Design a protein with these regions (language model features):
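DG-centered beta-turn motif at the end of beta-strands
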Residues: 8-11
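Active-site histidine-anchored catalytic micro-motif
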Residues: 130-137
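Terminal accessory/targeting
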Residues: 2-5, 15-56, 60-127, 139-284
């Protein structure tokens, strides 16, 4: 049997994302979400999560995306741009790492601050993942595992989507990035396993990240139904493309993603193919 976690990333980012995650959980197939500790709608998201106890909760470690740190910017300057925010893309962050510009005590301090803020909310956390998957970089992963053990969190996302899975991909640049990050993630799998952590056997949503619609969602679900085992699908739902797009220049199609995971066609396919919907807490 295929078991599927549908995780909505970026909970807390904005009220329009929070509302979409809850809508997708109540009326769609979303089973899990991951929180940005430094997002602008934190208190609202925590309250919503507590009112929906079947929704799995993860920590979404942010080190990129032009987002704000949880720490005072003066305490983590090596992680930030001159504007006091994280670099925009994973390429920018990786350049900083491999040119020796990142202070690792600052990196540990910020990751700990993000973890602590979410843990102090009283939510039961099922797993850790990362914005643009920076949590699996070999220089970041040991800190993430250390924090997971400190807070008794037993699962970490491994975003190693198959390099052969293109699924209506429209951007060669995105495809190259996906292959690189998936390779890094695959190398992280033994480390995560050897530290007694769980993850899914398969991951989907990287090549279509921010651009999932009904057509490519069906391509993903067909792949899920053909592979017995545990799967995670990453999505990014939201309620207002214009509002969110003006604030976050990521090019996401938030509304399309929400509509796809809530559609009757999606529900029917999952029932007909006996795909069991779970969250990370069910892996343990």
């Amino acid at each position: 049997m295929s078991k599927l976690i549908v995780n909505a990333d970026d909970f807390v980012l904005h009220s329009a994302v929070n509302a979409a995650v809850i809508d997708g959980h109540r009326t769609g197939i979303i089973t899990s979400t991951s929180l940005l500790a430094g997002g602008e709608a934190f208190s609202e998201a925590v309250s919503m999560a507590k009112n929906n106890p079947k929704l799995g909760i993860g920590v979404h470690i942010a080190l990129v995306g032009g987002l704000k740190p949880v720490c005072n910017p003066a305490e983590v300057p090596s992680l930030l741009t001159s504007e006091g925010v994280f670099p925009e893309t994973y390429i920018d962050f990786m350049k900083r790492i491999y040119t020796g510009k990142i202070n690792y005590s600052e990196l540990r301090k910020e990751i700990h601050a993000q973890m602590e803020r979410i843990m102090e909310s009283g939510l039961h956390v099922t797993h850790i993942d990362g914005h643009q998957h920076m949590h699996v970089l070999p220089t970041v992963l040991p800190i993430v595992i250390e924090q997971a053990k400190q807070y008794s969190i037993n699962a970490i996302r491994i975003p190693d989507e198959s390099s052969l899975f293109v699924n209506y991909m429209y951007s060669p640049v995105r495809l190259l990035g996906k292959v690189g990050l998936s390779t890094v993630a695959a190398k992280a799998r033994p480390t995560i396993r050897d530290n007694g952590m769980y993850s899914t056997q398969y991951f989907w949503g990287m090549v279509n990240g921010g651009h999932i619609n009904q057509k490519n969602l069906m391509g993903i679900l067909k792949s899920v139904s053909k592979k017995s085992g545990t799967h995670e699908l990453m999505i990014h739902p939201g309620l207002n493309n214009t509002l969110l797009g003006n604030q976050y220049k990521w090019g996401y199609h938030w509304e399309d993603e929400l509509q796809a995971v809530c559609s009757n066609h999606t529900h029917l396919y999952i029932r007909q193919h006996n795909i069991e919907l779970i969250n990370y807490g069910d892996l343990i």
